[in-house]
């Protein structure tokens, strides 16, 4: 559902579609510069990163393979428990590759820091995080984001 169809339920738009696309273009240019000539793998975190990943891939001036992870860190509520389970692991061996985790928004940072540590244990050349948005007021751990 888009903002036009939310009617009275929508108080205000925090970030416009144009601002989102401009930020994704900026991120794509940074990624292209940093990973030029490197064996890059984009890793999306399901399900939230699907749209951001699709838009980011369209904005990239290069092609890069993509893989997906799905994890769960929410118990019965909506707050992160900090206990993470892998629901869908990568299909790709990341040994020696440059891994860029793509996320839509960082909330507490607990799940993302766990994913990063998990991927770092698999001997990649590097693991970095790319996110469109973050909620600094919700942060429970410091997550280093490019």
Where are these regions (language model features)?
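PRPP-associated nucleotide enzymes
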Residues: 1-146
